[in-house]
């Protein structure tokens, strides 16, 4: 899969950049220092000139520190900036993957992969600028309990030299809750099938799950198990984060789903990650119609090219219903292999 190929490339960069002693280090709590709300002073390189502005960020911990999510907003030189960073930790490789998304597009960018050594974190990704291949580096440094420094740099010569184009100096604040953007438009009825399609999931839930024991094998044997989870709205509902903890017959399952709305094409992208490796799967992409959501992705399962469908119904009912199904004939027929029924425990509170 392309995701694994790219990750392997970035893994090699991170390993070359890290001392041997750092590769075996348990770094699952490296980002714990970010807990809370931050004031951020930013400098951005625009047409060879640095532009300065200010923003605010909120950090939330996931999986007891093995993942986290940052909301961020600022009034930049080109207008309002609203984004988030999802960070996930792989306990096998001891590496972090950092995924950025901007609310204008609702897409997770390719992961920056790396780790911390001596309180400094370096994370790398590959990209293209005007058709030219480049490396991108994130560096976290000067970390205390109340301050931190972040730089983004670009290299066009394979990492021999770097040019910084984004610098952030952060100071922890106790001014109160992270403020929602003041310029969000009022919600309209059509928003329920668009940017607010998942609003009803906000809060805490009990899960009753049914899993088909063997997929694409003609099986009709199912296993039932139970779990709990929480859904947190982000970007005033135009994104949200679901966390799930399940005690299954094969052991504990911890996962998350990050859902991002793309206002340009009015689709949702649903990203799943499992705590066992921290890797984010290819997104399920789709829409709501009259409260019914269908989301699709292509993947490989058991050497089959598989079309995957997520199906959401009854989101406003006391028990929202979810089904996952696979098709190996281009969507002509479907095999349902995962069913979830939810029961609300508590509404969302900030």
Please name every model-derived segment.
Residues 8-17:
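Bacterial N-terminal signal peptides
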Residues 21-350:
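Hydrophobic small-molecule pocket/channel-lining residues, especially in calycin-type beta-barrels
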Residues 1-8:
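Bacterial N-terminal signal peptides that target proteins for export
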